[in-house]
Amino acid sequence: MNMIRFITIPDFADYQVTLKLMEDYVNKVISDHEPEIIYLVEHSEVYTAGTNYKQEELLNYGDIPVIYTGRGGKFTFHGPGQRVIYPILNLASPNRHKDLKLYIKMLEEWIINSLNYFGIKAYIIKDKVGIWAKVRKDEFAKIAAIGVRVRKWVTYHGVAINISTDLSKFSGIIPCGLENSLITSLNQLGIHVEMSEFDKIIQTEFNKIFK
């Protein structure tokens, strides 16, 4: 098995610059010029809209830029304290499957297992996209968002996990189109972890799921 490289982009990355980087690399993977890769990013503040967005779900964005992307999903927020993971994987390669639903299920399992390592019980909730953590009895809050795109069976975009994110920024949108849904982070759940430590665990857990 070839180990996939994880590349950490330094500082707070501009979303549009990162999107261009992803798209260029996807083209290289499609052309068999480059191997699979996973980018680890912490963005400067930005609201992004997926292909299923509704404009009324953008409530009050203030001076935070809004970017309309080609990923699946609706509005979300990216900013400091959030680990964004962009796997660029070739689902057409012999060791993978041309199955987008399976890929998303594997992403979910990967993130759930990574959160479990830190003592956070995370869940998938029917008809609600993303990864959810229990915050009170029978009450759940979203801790990670998922939005992907595939071109010629090569994946891009990915997952955003709230580590120490300023959760007040989510009030400028209806996150993922889910009205009245709570948003949480590792910090809010009492788990204080350095981004570098979190990255080590997601790399370990990735290799258990994406063999």
UniProtKB/Swiss-Prot annotation:
Transmembrane segments: none annotated. One of its GO terms (molecular function) is lipoyl(octanoyl) transferase activity. The keyword 4Fe-4S does not apply. Its EC number is 2.3.1.181. InterPro entries: aa-tRNA-synth_II/BPL/LPL, BPL_LPL_catalytic, Octanoyltransferase, Octanoyltransferase_CS. One of its GO terms (cellular component) is cytoplasm. In the reaction, the free carboxyl group of octanoic acid is attached via an amide linkage to the epsilon-amino group of a specific lysine residue of lipoyl domains of lipoate-dependent enzymes. This is Octanoyltransferase. It comes from Rickettsia massiliae (strain Mtu5).
